[in-house]
């Protein structure tokens, strides 16, 4: 029993699996996901900017200013 415990503690992370590390990432998948997220954020940002630009140029109401307020 003591030998089994020492064998488990000798492995990285204390797991019985041996060489499999749970903190290794598939960087290609992470990169693709990041690029997709960045592209979507860029497109949404452009849509927000363009929608505000076209809406603000429409019917502007000018307020009349009295000379007393100046």
Curated annotation (Swiss-Prot):
One Gene Ontology cellular component: basolateral plasma membrane
Query: Which residue ranges does the record annotate as region Disordered?
Result: 1-20
- Alphabetically ordered keywords of this record: Ion transport, Membrane, Potassium, Potassium transport, Sodium, Sodium transport, Sodium/potassium transport, Transmembrane, Transmembrane helix, Transport
| A Pfam short name | ATP1G1_PLM_MAT8
Tissue expression, as annotated, is: Highest levels expressed in the kidney and spleen. Restricted to the basolateral membrane in renal epithelial cells and varies in its level of expression along the nephron.
- Gene Ontology biological process: cellular hyperosmotic salinity response; establishment or maintenance of transmembrane electrochemical gradient; intracellular potassium ion homeostasis; intracellular sodium ion homeostasis; negative regulation of cell population proliferation; potassium ion import across plasma membrane; proton transmembrane transport; regulation of monoatomic ion transport
Give the bilayer topology: Single-pass type III membrane protein
Q: Which residues cross the membrane?
A: 33-50
User: Major location, coarse class?
Assistant: membrane
| Family, similarity comment | Belongs to the FXYD family.
**PANTHER family, per this entry?**
SODIUM/POTASSIUM-TRANSPORTING ATPASE SUBUNIT GAMMA, SODIUM_POTASSIUM-TRANSPORTING ATPASE SUBUNIT GAMMA
Q: What is this protein called?
A: Sodium/potassium-transporting ATPase subunit gamma
- What species is this protein from? Mus musculus (Mouse)
Its gene is: Fxyd2
């Amino acid at each position: 029993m003591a030998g089994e415990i020492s064998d488990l503690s000798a492995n990285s992370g204390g797991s019985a699996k041996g060489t499999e590390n749970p903190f290794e990432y598939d960087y290609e998948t992470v990169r693709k996901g990041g690029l997709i997220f960045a592209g979507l954020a860029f497109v949404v940002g452009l849509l927000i900017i363009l929608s505000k630009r076209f809406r603000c140029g429409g019917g502007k109401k000018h307020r009349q200013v009295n000379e007393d307020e100046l």
